[in-house]
């Protein structure tokens, strides 16, 4: 009962936000969302938060100064030897216009991380989206 009332209240709040802040058709455009998954450990142990932040400032920000989002996550993966590993992770989410140039910049970020932190892999997921501002 309480959950239903809360759901109705949230739904009403969202509806009122839509009415107050309508998106014009021109505010939306097709874009490409790229999510880059970074494990925060290497063969020596955890990668320090300061090292991660330095990487973001040195590698990610110059390539996408208009903005991106960093999500704190926990990941699980299987290495080449079949062992299951669990580690703290970061996901960098970038939404861009879908040009080959922007995708190349994302690939550069992944390659730099693999090189700098001796990683077997960095996962990149590309999804077509409609972005509205």
Model-derived features with residue positions:
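Short, low-complexity, disordered segments immediately C-terminal to signal peptides
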Residues: 19-26
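Bacterial N-terminal signal peptides that target proteins for export
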Residues: 1-4
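Bacterial signal peptide processing site
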Residues: 15-17
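Terminal, regulation- and interaction-focused segments at domain boundaries
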Residues: 29-49
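Mature extracytoplasmic domains of secretory-pathway proteins
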Residues: 54-89, 94-101
């Amino acid at each position: 009962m309480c959950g239903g009332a809360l759901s109705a209240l949230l739904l009403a709040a969202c509806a009122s936000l839509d009415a107050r802040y309508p998106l014009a058709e021109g505010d939306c455009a097709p874009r490409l969302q790229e999510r880059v998954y970074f494990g925060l450990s290497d063969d020596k142990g955890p990668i320090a938060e300061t090292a991660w932040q330095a990487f973001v400032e040195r590698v990610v920000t110059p390539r996408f100064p208009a903005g991106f989002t960093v999500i704190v996550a926990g990941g699980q993966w299987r290495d080449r030897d079949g062992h299951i590993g669990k580690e703290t992770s970061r996901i960098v989410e970038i939404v861009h216009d879908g040009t080959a140039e922007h995708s190349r910049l994302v690939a550069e970020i992944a390659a730099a991380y693999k090189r700098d932190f001796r990683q077997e892999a960095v996962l990149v997921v590309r999804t077509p989206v409609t972005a509205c501002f």
